[in-house]
From Swiss-Prot:
Keywords: Lyase, Magnesium, Metal-binding. This is L-rhamnonate dehydratase. It comes from Escherichia coli (strain ATCC 8739 / DSM 1576 / NBRC 3972 / NCIMB 8545 / WDCM 00012 / Crooks). The keyword Lyase applies. The gene is rhmD. GO terms for biological process: amino acid catabolic process; carbohydrate catabolic process.
Length: 405
């Protein structure tokens, strides 16, 4: 009988945070909205709060960056560690150290699905349909996958069954698709700046932005709009048709997450050939099943918010069963290792975090070390050939551990 590798148990889980409401703004990291002044990501982008004039100019004005970065580290009995980052800050630390720890410590490093189900079941009474608790669970789940990969000496994508393509090709999200084209990306996604409270004038302004970028980028470069939950179905439908002459590839997250009937109506009324996409702020497997049933073209879960890699794999299966694409929202290496194994993810998103989109800055800078960025719009699978997720934690980021157990 052949010997089977003996896997260690998990000795301890620890949680830190950095940035957030108690820190100077601009920490970046897992909370990538937390950027300094004069950054495109905080420049009059339409949001659900834009209808209030006091909060329309800046997303930070209503507190988009108050949570900060959560760092979860799991240590095995043999001393090896895995870690991950997400957006949950100090409150996420409390959930990990005071509640979730009991489901993690003492388990085998391979017991990821068991731990995941126990975390979901135990928090159901206060987690609702996602949000902060799901961000925290996602971070733990990713840290467990990182540890498992390091213990067995394999990259996470090989733990999932291996790559189905040699490289990942990317589109860029940011304010300058024209610069993204020069960098080799296949497309550029811009934020909208106006919403229903601006009336038809807002539609004309955002459509003019698309027209300007179409002229700069040429006919074959993808252009998309990210509406960040800021619209209603009538406004979104009118905006989609206003942008149709400029070959807009898709219109994204026009509506709040739970407005499934409105998503179904938007898909039904959108211009022929224009895709409707959403999912970034959906936080449970069940919500993605319902979203899939609306008939949208692409589901866009964030692996750091939807329940982690364990849930992302299940979401991809739901999408595949309906002939839909799954293209995760940003998330750097945590997405890379997943999507290179998905047959229904022909491309992925790279979020431009440099202030003016003119340089290639890693998404989670400075919290991750050795975080890869696309070269000519692509990342080859060989770049991912390191144990776990292949990145290291930058412990010089003023990490604070407010709780212990």
């Amino acid at each position: 009988m052949e010997n089977i590798m003996t896997l260690p148990k998990i000795k301890q889980v620890r949680a830190w945070f950095t940035g957030g409401a108690t820190a100077e703004k601009g920490a970046g990291g897992g909370d990538y909205h937390d950027q300094g002044a004069n950054h495109w990501i905080d420049d009059h982008i339409a949001t659900p709060m834009s209808k209030y004039r006091d909060y329309e100019q800046s997303r930070q004005s209503f507190g988009i960056n108050v949570l900060g970065t959560l760092v979860v580290e799991v240590e095995a009995e043999n001393g090896q560690t895995g870690f991950a980052v997400s957006t949950a800050g100090e409150m996420g630390c409390f959930i990990v150290e005071k509640h979730l720890n009991r489901f993690i410590e003492g388990k085998c490093v391979s017991d990821i699905k068991l731990i995941h189900d126990q975390m979901l079941s135990a928090t159901l009474y206060y987690s609702g349909s996602g949000g902060l608790v799901m961000n925290t669970i996602s971070c733990v789940d990713l840290a467990l996958w990182d540890l498992f990969g390091k213990v067995v000496g394999l990259p996470v994508y090989k733990l999932l069954g291996g790559a189905v393509r040699d490289e990942i090709q990317f589109y860029a999200t940011g304010a300058r698709p024209d610069l993204a084209k020069e960098m080799g990306f296949i497309g550029g996604k811009m934020p909208t700046h106006w919403g229903p409270h601006d009336g038809d004038a807002g539609i004309r302004k955002d459509a003019a932005m698309v027209a300007d970028m179409r002229e700069k980028c040429g006919e074959d470069f993808w252009l998309m709009l990210d509406c960040w939950m800021s619209q209603d179905v009538n406004y979104a439908t009118k905006l989609a048709h206003a942008c149709a002459p400029y070959n807009l590839k898709w219109i994204e997250e026009c509506l709040p997450p739970q407005q499934y009937e409105s998503y179904r109506e938007l898909k039904r009324n959108a211009p022929v050939g224009m895709m409707v996409t959403s999912g970034e702020h959906h936080g449970t497997l069940q919500s993605f099943r319902t979203l899939s049933e609306t008939g949208i073209d692409i589901m866009q879960p964030d692996v750091g918010w939807c329940g982690g890699l364990t849930t992302l794999v299940e979401i991809a299966a739901i999408a595949k069963s309906r002939g839909q694409l799954v293209v995760p929202h940003g998330s750097s290496v945590y997405s890379h290792h997943a999507v290179i194994t998905f047959t229904n993810t022909p491309f992925s998103e790279f979020l431009m975090t440099s202030p003016d989109c003119s340089t290639m800055r890693p998404q989670f800078d400075p919290i991750l070390l050795n975080e890869p960025v696309p070269v000519n719009g692509r990342i080859h699978k060989s770049v991912l050939d390191k144990p776990g997720f292949g990145v290291e934690l930058n412990r010089d980021c003023n990490l604070k551990r407010p709780y212990s157990h």
